[in-house]
Amino acid sequence: MAESQKNQTEKENIVELKTNIYLLSIIGEVEGHESLGERTKATRYEHILPALARAEEDKSIDGLLILLNTVGGDVEAGLAIAEMIASMRKPAVSLVLGGGHSIGVPLAVAADYSLIVPSATMVIHPVRTNGMFIGVAQTYRNMEKTQDRITGFVSAHSKITKERLEELMLDTKMLVKDVGTMLDGPQAVKKA
């Protein structure tokens, strides 16, 4: 290990263990094509995708453990990571700690086995965007297709139906000033 890498590891209080399980942390906001600020805790998909490819090809790695504590983020980047996790030949386990919100839901269910601690939460909501809308009808159709990609992925990789997931996404009784549902650990398992 290079001296600078060793110093960084010690600074971050990371202990390297010799193991055949690849540990992947997805924390903060999932960053996509637009760069988030330096002060924003983020997982960058351009770092995660090559790491997953290396783990898949490394013969010394037998499986993958994904630790999730994310507020969500970029849909395209999140789905790209989720698709890559789901397509891996090596077994993968996801563990939701804290939160698996928004695009974190597909990331959680992409693994072969998905676990959530009782104190963790998952927020399910419709696709959102901000900024100016020029073509309202076209933008709506595009967002609807994007949401269909998400609900299709989640229902294909979990025990929840697409209809039930959409029902939870569009619930107006749970979140103040918003549409969607917040589920804690046990609820996330039961609702599916």
Over which residues does each language-model region extend?
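Terminal-region recognition feature
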Residues: 1-192
